[in-house]
Design a protein with these regions (language model features):
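Alpha-helical transmembrane segments of multi-pass inner-membrane proteins
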Residues: 15-23, 40-48, 57-85, 91-164, ...
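Hydrophobic alpha-helical transmembrane segments in integral membrane proteins
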Residues: 191-206
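Transmembrane signal-anchor hairpin modules in multi-pass inner-membrane enzymes, especially those
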Residues: 1-23, 31, 52-60, 64-67, ...
Length: 360
């Protein structure tokens, strides 16, 4: 089994999170346990890519695979928008918000490939693809995606300054931090634009539809089932029950409260909420240690940005709960973290950087 460096913390986080989900499911009926077991299909890709990248040089395959997938998604979005500019663009996802989540995960890696590419033709193609991805992100009109991206840029800038030991006089650090802040400003302007376009205003009770009602109902579910919650996969049934459904609620078809911490608190109680919290924390530790260990700070910043954007988006939408978006997250995080550590040898196998020289 190849070494995986600080990615071991992410592995522990995944094990604790889904272990807590299995415990919560086992404490309820077979339906809940089955829903917990279903998550196997989501996180297995994380371990596959982690071990692949630790053992072999899969950089070219990943680069062109990610680029092809992103290009197909862009063509799909543009085709949907051309067919009906007023309709929601989804590109095969169940909703525009998971699509926006996937786009936010992907474009930082395309940006990285653009900065590293030396061949003029390919550099131009990556530039076109990057602009297309950002355009598709705007077409989703997802306020949560732009809010998450703005926060992700701000926190990534701060974290990378710490990682670079506060070298504010370094021109590359200044340039990257300035770029992140510009993107954050664009995200704020875009967020405000979409708020005005959807005529929701800035009132929390109206801006997010029935999100506040769903959060309040989820909290009541947890109050009644504090230790192991109502059971994985049972949120929809409980929310639309007479006991928990708000009288003012009109929206139909919600299967989660559009807030990942509250979803796992209500469905799995303290057990699952603790597992999710440790998952988020340990994953961050893995990404942070990888960023410190590598000399490729551009890649490290893009991996950190993808992770933080995904995390922040989880406060207003489904992220890790949505299987297609979650699989993309696990694949890119495993590849990104191991790429931060890996040094390619002549035989295309990979050795990890010597971490003994890195102060943790």
């Amino acid at each position: 089994i190849p070494q995986i460096g600080s990615a071991k913390w992410a592995v522990i986080g995944v094990a604790l999170f889904y272990g807590s989900m299995l415990i919560a499911g086992a404490c309820h009926d077979s339906h809940s346990l089955h829903k917990a077991f279903e998550e196997y299909s989501t996180y297995i890709i994380f371990f596959i890519v982690l071990l692949w990248r630790a053992r072999w040089n899969i950089d070219d395959g990943m680069k062109y695979g990610i680029a092809c997938g992103a290009a197909i998604t862009c063509v799909w979005v543009f085709a949907q928008y051309h067919a009906d500019p007023e309709a929601m663009v989804t590109a095969g996802f169940v909703h525009q918000n998971p699509l926006a989540t996937a786009l936010n995960l992907t474009w930082p890696f395309i940006f990285y490939y653009f900065t590293q590419e030396k061949r003029p033709v390919w550099k131009g193609l990556f530039a076109v693809l990057l602009v297309s991805l950002i355009s598709c992100l705007f077409l989703t009109t997802s306020r949560g995606a732009f809010m998450a991206l703005g926060l992700g840029c701000i926190f990534t800038s701060a974290i990378m300054i710490v990682v670079c030991h506060g070298r504010l006089k370094d021109k590359s650090v200044q340039r990257n931090a300035a770029a992140m802040l510009v993107v954050s400003l664009i995200c704020l302007i875009s967020f405000n634009y979409f708020v005005e376009e959807k005529h929701t205003g800035w009132d929390p009770d109206t801006m997010g539809g029935e999100r506040i009602m769903m959060l309040e109902a989820s909290y009541r579910m947890w109050q009644d089932h504090k230790m192991v919650g109502i059971g994985p996969g049972n949120w929809e049934e409980y929310y639309y029950s007479e006991k928990y459904h708000p009288k003012e609620g009109r929206e139909k078809g919600h299967v989660m409260p559009h807030n990942m911490p509250m979803l796992y608190l209500s469905e799995g109680g303290i057990v699952e909420a603790a597992g999710y919290s440790l998952f988020v924390l340990f994953f961050f530790v893995s990404v942070y240690k990888a960023a410190r260990a590598t000399s490729n700070k551009t890649l490290a910043a893009m991996v950190m940005l993808s992770y933080l954007t995904f995390f922040f988006h989880g406060f207003v939408d489904s992220t890790i709960f949505n299987k297609p978006a979650a699989r993309i997250f696990y694949m890119l995080m495993a590849y990104g973290m191991m790429s931060c550590y890996a040094v390619t040898n002549k035989n295309n196998s990979l050795d990890l950087l010597n971490q003994s020289s890195v102060k943790e």
